[in-house]
Every structure is written in structure tokens, then in C-alpha cells.
């Protein structure tokens, strides 16, 4: 099966970038999810495999607890905890690999550090409208995940034969999480061929699934139940749903990062629903609301994310951020739903 993504000129550029690099930084977006973390660590494992030993994986902030088992996770450097170390890594880098984000602003507080680096930049991503001021841009929004792209690149670089179980596990985790356990954006035959190739590397797919999706605390499950029971609003005639979550509610249930992961997908189980919106107060920044959108059944939420929520992402899975109160954010969400009422009806 044909997996190659790069033409001859591009693969030559990639080989040169890697062969000439000694100090490599790998970075991903703020609030790194399974795909961001999995692709970054998988790329690190591959680079180790080809003899690159001075690699720094730098994240803007914390990964969810359910990803801490990923092989190599203990090497991740958080900018919000160790800023000087991250700044030093970028300053000394002779190659910066940007994984799973399309715009510099997606690294949040780490943006200035990223942009101050004079090293050539390699972008590997599957989001729409990527920045292109890179030595090489590998952007494929049609792919299921950045992890899928990483697998394809490793294969094209003749790295599959020596791929470790650790690397394969990271790739599988990212592909799995970015497709909701292969329930959406995962209908191409190539995806299941790749899964077969990863299984041949002795990954334990059931264990990976359980570590990610069956890893909630009692408090997390009660928080999720509270939101669905008491906070979820459904506009039946417009096939839309939204909910708000305040800092106080999160504190009541002892919220930790990852407790609400994937919750925005749950309302999509309602028959005929086309749009689900999550509005959550940022626990660290005042008057900041984090927005997640999911869509299905022929409606695409990405334009709404860009128009109303200062965001973007994928056609059916997008995010954004509002600098306002949670009450104001709710009114913006209602306005957005009404704006697209003809498409939602």
C-alpha cells in the first residue's frame, strides 16, 4: 500500500535536515493531547533510532495524567515549570520540529521562545491553514492525525524495520485518541493497514485503550455526570447542544487536567445532533473561556470556531478561546448557533 507523502525533493530536504542536526528540539501545542504527545515522543524515538541523542521534547504545559505512561514521557520539559531550560534548548537548537500545530500562537506562552530560534524549522501537522515559513512543511489535513503522518514519514525514511515497540505505541495512542478510538475521521484503508503494521511491532492495543479511556477518578466521573445531567443544554430544533463549566464546579469535583477530555463528544450520541459545544473557564487565567466544538451529520464546526471563538482546527473537531466571562461566552455560543441555524435545522 502506498504510504509515501513526500516527493523526491521533499524527502531529500528532510534527510538533509536530519543528517545536519545535532541539537534537536521537538515541540507541540498548549494542552498537549494524545496526538501532540504521541507524535512528539514517536518522532523522538525515531530520531534516537538514527543516532540523534541530544533531543529535547518541549511542551508549553502539562499533559493529562492518562498520557504519562507513554514511553519517553519522563523526558518532556514543560515551559511553565522549567522556562530557562526550554529557552536554552531552543537557543542551542540547530533543528526545531513543530508537531501537531499549524500556527505559532498554538504554543501560547512559549511562542516568543519558538520565534526567537534561528534554527531551521520542520513542521509536521494535520490542521488547516499551516504557517509555511519553514525549511519543510509537511501538512496533510486529510490525515487522521499527526501520528499517522509521523508513521508515514518514518516508513518513507526506511525506518519501519527498526521501529521499536515504544515508538509504535506512541503512534497508535495518537491515532486512537484523535479519532475517538477510530470512530471518526478514520475510514481510509491506509489507517487500518498502518494499525496492522503497528500491531506487528508488538504493541498492546487493548492496554493502550484502557490506559487512556478507562483511567478516570471517581471525582472525574462525577464531574462528567454533573455536566451531562445539570449543565447540558439541547436545542432540539437546531440539533445543537452546549454546556458551561465554571471554576467553582471544577473545584467542587477536584478537577485535574484530563478529567473532561472527550466529554464534548458525548452529546453527539443524541440522535440527529449536529453540533456540540463545550465552554469551560480556564482554571489559571481570569476571564478566559476554553471552547471545544464537535460536529457531525453534515455540519462542519470549523468555520464557526474561526468566526465566533477565535479558533479553528478540523472540519468536525475545532477549538477556540474567549476573553470574557462564562456568562458572556454562553451568549456568544447561542449567537453562533443561531447564525448557522439554516445549516443546523
Regions found by a protein language model. Name each.
Residues 2-30, 38-71, 78, 84-87, ...:
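Hydrophobic helix-and-loop "lid/oligomerization" segment in the mid-to-C-terminal part
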Residues 72-76, 116, 139-142, 295:
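Short, hinge-like loop/turn segments at secondary-structure boundaries
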Residues 77-136:
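Active-site cofactor/cluster-binding pocket
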Residues 124-194:
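Short alpha-helices
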Residues 34-40, 104-108:
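Short glycine/serine/threonine-rich phosphate/pyrophosphate-binding segments
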Residues 43-44, 113-116, 139-140, 193:
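Glycine-rich, phosphate-binding/catalytic loops in enzymes
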Residues 31-32, 101-104, 127-129, 247-248, ...:
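Short glycine-rich anion-binding loops that position phosphate/pyrophosphate groups of nucleotides
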Residues 27, 31, 98, 123-124, ...:
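Generic enzyme active-site microenvironment
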Amino acid at each position: 500500500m502506498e504510504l509515501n507523502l513526500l516527493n523526491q525533493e521533499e524527502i531529500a530536504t528532510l534527510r538533509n535536515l536530519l543528517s545536519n542536526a545535532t541539537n534537536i528540539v521537538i515541540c507541540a501545542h498548549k494542552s498537549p493531547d494524545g496526538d501532540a504527545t504521541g507524535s512528539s515522543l514517536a518522532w523522538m524515538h525515531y530520531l534516537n533510532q538514527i543516532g540523534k541523542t541530544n533531543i529535547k521534547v518541549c511542551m508549553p504545559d502539562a499533559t493529562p495524567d492518562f498520557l504519562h505512561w507513554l514511553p519517553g514521557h519522563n523526558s518532556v520539559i514543560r515551559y511553565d515549570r522549567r522556562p530557562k531550560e526550554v529557552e536554552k534548548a531552543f537557543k542551542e537548537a540547530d533543528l526545531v520540529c513543530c508537531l501537531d500545530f499549524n500556527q505559532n500562537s498554538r504554543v501560547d506562552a512559549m511562542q516568543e521562545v519558538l520565534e526567537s530560534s534561528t534554527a531551521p524549522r520542520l513542521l509536521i501537522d494535520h490542521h488547516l491553514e499551516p504557517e509555511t515559513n519553514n525549511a519543510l512543511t509537511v501538512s496533510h489535513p486529510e490525515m487522521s492525525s499527526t501520528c499517522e503522518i509521523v508513521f508515514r514519514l518514518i516508513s518513507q525514511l526506511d525506518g519501519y524495520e527498526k521501529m521499536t515497540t515504544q515508538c509504535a505505541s506512541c503512534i497508535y495512542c495518537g491515532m486512537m485518541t484523535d479519532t475517538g478510538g477510530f470512530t471518526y475521521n478514520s475510514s481510509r484503508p491506509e489507517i487500518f493497514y498502518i494499525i496492522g503494521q503497528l500491531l506487528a511491532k508488538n504493541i498492546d492495543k487493548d492496554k493502550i485503550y484502557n490506559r487512556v479511556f478507562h483511567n478516570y477518578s471517581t471525582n472525574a466521573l462525577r464531574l462528567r455526570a454533573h455536566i451531562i445531567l445539570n449543565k447540558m443544554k439541547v436545542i432540539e430544533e437546531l440539533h445543537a447542544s452546549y454546556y458551561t463549566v465554571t471554576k467553582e464546579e471544577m473545584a467542587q469535583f477536584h478537577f485535574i487536567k484530563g478529567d473532561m477530555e472527550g466529554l464534548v463528544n458525548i452529546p453527539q450520541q443524541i440522535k440527529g445532533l449536529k453540533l456540540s459545544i463545550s465552554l469551560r473557564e480556564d482554571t489559571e487565567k481570569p476571564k478566559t473561556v476554553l471552547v471545544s466544538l464537535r460536529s457531525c451529520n453534515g455540519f462542519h464546526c470549523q468555520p464557526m470556531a474561526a468566526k465566533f471563538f477565535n479558533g479553528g482546527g478540523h472540519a468536525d473537531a475545532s477549538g477556540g478561546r474567549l476573553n470574557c466571562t462564562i456568562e458572556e461566552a454562553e451568549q456568544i455560543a447561542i449567537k453562533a448557533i443561531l447564525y448557522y441555524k439554516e445549516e443546523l435545522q
